[in-house]
């Protein structure tokens, strides 16, 4: 993409309403624009990152054997009355009446709807196990939306639902989700720690939240510092292997890590004092096992091998897709702007022409642009007739992992400058070597 033809409305000044780093930088980098309180339009740069995150989530869910689908944003209130949650959910749920006087709601979650789909179409234990998921916009009428996409009223979320014949099978589904979430977050450049949490309005007595440690986090968390040394890495997982998935769960949850709702001071005191930590965390996902809560209430049953009609065991599993953008920025930025991890960057590399209109510089930039594009990457070429300082400031603000700078002086020596946004280190390379190094960084991604 050529910046002269792109829509990137960057701001020089920080809007007064932005209270935290991610909100400030998303507004300044032209990623979002507020439409109303807690509701945002996603401008091209922000939308590209959103799609990158969606792609990772889809890939990892399907790697785990989960089946994608799509449910509507509007739901019938009758289903929620059936489960008993219509009145329990409170004012966060936006209630709507259509022209025929039917009560509807803008779904804050989908347990009732997916249970209705299941009970209408599945009747035998032979159809189990089954895990369905979707990525859809949701709405919760927050009293005081703030912090940009971190606590908005409208947000994009992946939620998945497993249906199993037994508790043991449902807990294996729980473990599969934990593994797939760990893989997803690491691909996004995040360390998200699974912590024992409270079930809230969704319910269930077994649940983990995934939290990214950050000073701006809304949750207070308590944990054993050893857990921050864990990494999923590039290990291979057989999602059908019960023991292997259970081992990952035990590895990542055996140390003390809890949110404030479930914090146990006596248990925490058993952690060696030097390893005890308290901090703030940003919730970016949560997994639940809630047994037969919804299947009992809504009649989601199957015939087992002994011809008995039994309720299915269920779980619900969510990732805050739009919130992840804010969490990534909170975890990866400096005083100049965003520092995108390579897995979610909107463009793979920036190209800065220091002297637009110079024949040699223009030709070299076009050559770099073509070479990167042919290699399957998406470069952003700043071909505007602007001063160099302004071009550098824009590139630093939007945070692309790599920048190739081209100028007449360097070209006379046969080199361009390749700069890492993360480290700030630069090196002079031939144009061909610069392209090769950038391409190698994304090989296999």
Curated annotation (Swiss-Prot):
GO CC annotations, alphabetized: cytosol
Molecular function as annotated in GO: ATP binding; proline-tRNA ligase activity
Matches recorded under CDD domains: ProRS_anticodon_short (cd00861), ProRS_core_prok (cd00779)
Disulfide bonds listed in the record: none
Record GO biological process: prolyl-tRNA aminoacylation
Coiled coil: none
Catalysed transformations (reactions): tRNA(Pro) + L-proline + ATP = L-prolyl-tRNA(Pro) + AMP + diphosphate
Top-rank taxon: Bacteria
Known EC number: 6.1.1.15
Family affiliation: Belongs to the class-II aminoacyl-tRNA synthetase family. ProS type 2 subfamily.
Quaternary structure, from the entry: Homodimer.
Summary of the function given for this chain in its UniProt record: Catalyzes the attachment of proline to tRNA(Pro) in a two-step reaction: proline is first activated by ATP to form Pro-AMP and then transferred to the acceptor end of tRNA(Pro).
Protein name: Proline--tRNA ligase
